[in-house]
Swiss-Prot record:
Native organism: Macrococcus caseolyticus (strain JCSC5402) (Macrococcoides caseolyticum)
UniProt KW keywords: Cytoplasm, Methyltransferase, RNA-binding, rRNA processing, S-adenosyl-L-methionine, Transferase
Gene: rsmA
Alphabetical list of CDD domains matching this protein: AdoMet_MTases (cd02440)
Cellular component GO terms, alphabetical: cytosol
Protein name: Ribosomal RNA small subunit methyltransferase A
Keyword Nucleotide-binding attached: no
Amino acid sequence: MEYNDIATPTRTKQLLDQYGFKFKKSLGQNFLVDTNVIRNIIEAAGIDKTSGVIEIGPGMGSLTEQLAKHAKQVLAFEIDQRLIPILGETLSPYDNVTVINEDILKADVASAIETYLHHCDEIFVVANLPYYITTPILMGLLEKNLNINSYVVMMQKEVGERLSAIPSTKAYGSLSIAVQYYTDVKRIMVVPKGVFMPPPNVDSLVVKLTTLERPRVDVEDENLFFKLTRGAFVQRRKTILNNYMSLIQDSKEHKSRIIEWLEASGVAPSRRGESLNLNDYAQLSNNMKKYPELVI
């Protein structure tokens, strides 16, 4: 397979000079200039000519053009207006790409899927995510329960490691729980910082998140479930009791009931949030309705 291409230092620099483009640090702009990394991302995504693909932050189109070669339709969200004319040039050979100049965090993604990808058999997200908003993007998409089969996304290595972290490890936290609630997580490859222009300060990690047919644990109130998981990690070194004392309204007068709720859920009050797994948090969430005086 022949990759022509934007994803080389020479071609990227030529485009930068041609358009007088200056990187905005506030937008976390680091353009990928390595075709081998892109090839691995495409292969991990497993897309074909029946697939619809959502890309977030296409930059100059280095990944986008390869997605266009493999997918039925590509829908790219780009927040930076200055990149729109560049993308108009670099993606001009492809009639199966739509670029929307919009912030993905504010976009109506469900409506966009219905408008642009309705004729595709399956929907995938494939993207080099901006470091500074990786978590809001991922959680925003996952929590919307969109009909997305899988996500192959590149992010800061440290953040990527959190996604697959297990209990009682340093990387484990509320993000690990939330992502594993919705998906199976697989690490694909570490990407060195030198394959970007400009290079970021840290290495990256490509991960594949395959959406589960149903969430990993049965939860009656997802909003409460996520409040409890986030609340358990506000201060990692504190016990689950102390963190929830800070989370629950009028907790001092309800302390005995909080302890009772924890113990009835099979969670010792002296444990730390990092030691609990998804089933533990599901049990806490589902049992809380039996204690109506405990309000978050």
